[in-house]
Structure formats: C-alpha cells, structure tokens
C-alpha cells in the first residue's frame, strides 16, 4: 500500500478490525513512520434492471424507497421499516447470483416483504405495480390477504 505522505510502497499492517461493511487496517510506513488507515471492501457487481421493454438501467434503490413511501403514506410504517424492506429486497436480488434482474422479480420481492409488513401498504403498492384492469383483480388480491 502506497504511503500518502512519502509515496513509499513499503508499509506494514499493525492492526486489523472488522468495520461495518469493510475491514479497517491501521498501517505504518516503513520509510517515514507515517501512520494511516485503509479500508478493504468487497467490490459488488453493478446490478442492471431489465425493464418491460427490454431496456437495461442501473439498479436504483431510491426508486423502491419512493414507491414504498408513496404506498405507506399515512400508515404506521416507519422510515426504518422502509429501509429494512429495501435492504431485504436488495439482499434477495444479490442472492440471485446475476448482475441482471427483471423489474418483475424486484416487484415480487417488494410484494413479499410488504405482505409481512402492512396489508394496506401492500394493497396500495400492488394496485400500482400490478396495474389492475378491473375491480375483480383487486377483489382476488383482497381474498388472498384475508386468507392469511
């Protein structure tokens, strides 16, 4: 690791600790004695979302957050609940072992999480996500919820 003070390539690790999503390493330059900290993180592959029209765009977790905030409006769903839901969805996506995922799959993951969180938020999200054509489709969803 190059020393930020003298640019020497010779340094040694004097301490390693687990940080949130990285390994924190305390280093000492063997040339000038300067102490510095580095972080080692896993490089995650960028996720691409395959839209209904087959276009691909980078995964944007904020889109999920916005959709959930809209669906949870005036509901007893905290911002922490929303953040946890999004984190769970992103974890499920990354477990697919692919750097491309269809938007439908993301929507289904969100629906699975919302079904456990709040029924009204689930219905609101589903009504937009599934684009119900008539009331009978909504009634079918409601029947499935009341069976729980």
UniProtKB/Swiss-Prot annotation:
Molecular function, one GO term: DNA binding
unnamed zinc-finger residues: 3-32
Keyword annotations of the record: ATP-binding, DNA-binding, Metal-binding, Nucleotide-binding, Repressor, Transcription, Transcription regulation, Zinc, Zinc-finger
Role noted for this protein: Negatively regulates transcription of bacterial ribonucleotide reductase nrd genes and operons by binding to NrdR-boxes.
Domain of life of the source: Bacteria
Swiss-Prot/TrEMBL GO biological process terms: negative regulation of DNA-templated transcription
ATP-cone domain mapped to chain residues: 47-137
Cofactor or coenzyme needed: Zn(2+)
HAMAP family in UniProt: NrdR
Keyword Nucleotide-binding: yes
UniProt-listed NCBIfam families: transcriptional regulator NrdR (TIGR00244)
Protein family membership: Belongs to the NrdR family.
Protein name (Swiss-Prot/TrEMBL): Transcriptional repressor NrdR
Cofactor detail note: Binds 1 zinc ion.
Gene name of the encoded protein: nrdR
Organism the protein comes from: Lactococcus lactis subsp. lactis (strain IL1403)
A Pfam family hit: ATP-cone
InterPro entries, per database record: ATP-cone_dom, NrdR-like_N, RNR_NrdR-like
Membrane-crossing residue ranges in chain numbering: none
């Amino acid at each position: 690791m190059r020393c930020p003070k003298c640019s020497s390539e010779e340094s040694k690790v004097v301490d390693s600790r687990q940080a949130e999503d990285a390994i924190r390493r305390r280093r000492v330059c063997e040339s000038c004695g300067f102490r510095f900290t580095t972080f080692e993180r896993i490089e995650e592959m960028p996720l691409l979302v395959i839209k209904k029209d087959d276009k691909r765009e980078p995964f944007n977790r904020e889109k999920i957050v916005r959709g959930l905030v809209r669906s949870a409006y005036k509901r007893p769903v905290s911002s922490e609940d929303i953040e946890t839901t999004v984190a769970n969805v992103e974890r499920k996506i990354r477990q697919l072992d692919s750097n491309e995922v269809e938007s439908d799959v993301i929507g289904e993951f969100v629906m699975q999480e919302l079904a456990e969180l709040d029924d009204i938020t689930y219905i609101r999200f589903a009504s937009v996500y599934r684009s119900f054509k008539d009331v009978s489709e909504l009634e079918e969803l409601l029947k499935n919820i009341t069976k729980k």
